[in-house]
Amino acid sequence: GNGSTMGGVIVDAGNFDWSSGKFPEFTTPSDGYHGLVLHDVLGPAAYIAKVRIEGLRDLGAAISPFNAFQIIQGLETLEIRMKKHSENALALAEWLEAHEDVAWVNYPGLKSSKYNELAKKYLPEGQSGILAFGLKGGFDAGKTVADETKLFALVANFGDSKSLVIHPASTTHQQLTPEEQASTGVTPDLIRLSVGLENVEDLKADLQQAFDKV
């Protein structure tokens, strides 16, 4: 629950079409394997093969005992934490959507989202604590807000019990050209929030005081 360990379980039925054009990592030559095109050789098994030949190689076959302990400990409160993450994120997204300084908000729980029907179908209990938005002031406004928050921590992590903020265009993606940033979905104004478990009114107040400094 504190973002200190990440882990998961992969289940692959082996019947997904990876050649749809949306997954170039399976249909283009792999530099790490002498130009091998995974889908050409393995078809639907391309995904699980990539997990084994790259994930297993880079991350190892088993997590450490301490990380396993942290995951088990976190699972004890996962359900109640996810409900709070989702409730806070939806409330914050609705507040941002109505804010005069905000140009756009991307959160699938919003009724205005083009993904809302899918979100309700596949994520009926809540749509997570991750959301993104952009300010009308563009790049400079986004960077200022990320720098000026007090309750939100400025880090590239996500999924923590505490709220996190980042302005990708000036941090994680700053080495990319504007065209490369755009190809990854990063716009100059984009601010990503990982909404934590704090009182949502405190989170709104923190963002507002940062907006006021733009």
Task: Identify the function of each model-found stretch.
Residues 1-130, 134-161:
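Active-site C-terminal subdomain of aminotransferase-like
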